[in-house]
A protein has these predicted regions:
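Sec-dependent N-terminal signal peptides
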Residues: 4-13
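Sec/Tat signal peptide C-region and signal peptidase I cleavage site
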Residues: 15-19
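Extracytoplasmic substrate-binding proteins
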Residues: 20, 33, 111, 115-193, ...
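Short helix-initiation/N-cap motifs at beta->coil->alpha
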Residues: 24-26, 80-91, 222-231
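A short, structured surface patch at a secondary-structure boundary
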Residues: 38-96, 100-107, 218
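His/Asp/Glu-enriched short active-site or ligand-binding loop at hydrolase and phosphoryl-transfer sites
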Residues: 63, 200-226, 273
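Proline-aspartate-enriched helix->loop->beta-strand connector
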Residues: 89-103, 230-247
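A ligand-binding cleft/hinge motif common to bilobed small-molecule-binding domains
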Residues: 107-121, 241-260
Length: 307
């Protein structure tokens, strides 16, 4: 009997208990006692990740939709109430009585009572997508895997998280197999035309996204996240293809209008030959859908390959 008891104790002690903390943005945070049941997503791509994990029934709000104006007008995004056009005021956020708030960009969390530390002090768990953490690495697909793994554990959806990771890897592998052969197509990414020709340099996610699709970012050699160039610089690079972000504040249609009507930009090869691709803004963020996005880009770029 004594031996049986000792074996039972040894077995219990040898079984690892669920850690009482989780790691995010290089810090340890208190893990919730139970799976979150009132989740708020700040930024559309953060909501997309949660929805992909199957957390929709537990989501009580989403704010800051980037490319879905219809959902904002309807007041619901894939069944989740839209609580603010941009980031919600503190009273609006707290009124949702959230037990988990997930942000897509660092700006999602303020400096006051909506900061991560103040929210934690009020018993609200927070998570910031790893690609938005200060000083993050450039392993964007690794960030997606990490987001899925940690949030999958917090939500009790580990199997779903693993399935999403495997699906992303499969899509990335397939994208590489169908990418155009030969010299990679040069692509200029136009993020916004509001304050100039805003794009991304080598540190932005567009660079590895295009690489996965068999192309190269013409600004990859610039060691910055955000880059604004002038017309003359773009003309000198004369990219094979132009990628246009479609966002509520900067629609792809408006970018096309600029490119086709501007006396300088209209002379670009990609504009003259209509080798321009519209893509929803949120698909240009690192999310579980990034493998599928790279695969679709590879297919489109293959059809635009220069002989």
């Amino acid at each position: 009997m004594r031996r049986t008891l000792l074996l039972s104790l040894a077995f219990c002690c040898g079984t690892p208990a669920l850690a009482d903390s989780y790691r995010n943005c290089g810090q340890d945070w208190q893990r919730p006692a139970a799976a979150p049941a009132r989740i708020v997503a700040l930024n559309q791509h953060a909501a997309d990740l949660l929805l992909a994990l199957g957390a929709g029934p537990s989501m009580v709000g989403v704010a800051y939709l980037d490319d879905n104006g219809a959902a904002y007008k309807q007041g619901r995004y894939q069944g989740v109430p839209v609580i603010a056009r941009e980031y919600p005021a503190s009273e609006v956020l707290y009124a949702q009585r959230p037990d988990l708030v997930v942000g897509g960009f660092a700006t999602a969390f303020g400096d006051g009572i909506t900061s991560r530390s103040r929210l934690a002090g009020n018993g609200i768990v927070t998570y910031l997508l790893e690609s938005a953490c200060n000083g993050h690495s450039l392993d964007y697909y690794g960030h997606v895997r990490r987001d899925l793994t940690v949030l999958g554990e917090l939500l009790g959806r580990q199997a779903r998280a693993q399935a999403l990771i495997e699906a992303m890897e499969t899509d990335l592998t397939q994208a590489r197999t169908i990418a155009p052969s030969g010299k990679p197509l040069s692509v200029f990414y136009l993020d916004s035309e509001v304050r100039g020709l805003d794009s991304e340099g080598g540190r932005g996610f567009v660079t590895p996204l295009l690489a996965a699709a068999g192309a190269r970012n013409v600004l990859a050699g610039i060691d910055q996240y955000r880059v604004t160039i002038n017309r003359e610089a773009l003309l000198s690079s004369d990219p094979d293809v132009i990628l246009l972000a479609d966002a509520l504040w900067s629609p792809a249609s408006r970018k096309r209008q600029l490119l086709t009507r501007d006396p300088v930009l209209s002379s670009l090869r990609a504009v003259r030959e209509n080798r321009m691709i519209d893509i929803p803004f949120t698909q240009l963020m690192p999310t579980p859908a990034s493998g599928r996005v790279a695969l679709e880009l590879a297919r489109q770029l293959r059809g635009m390959a220069v002989p």
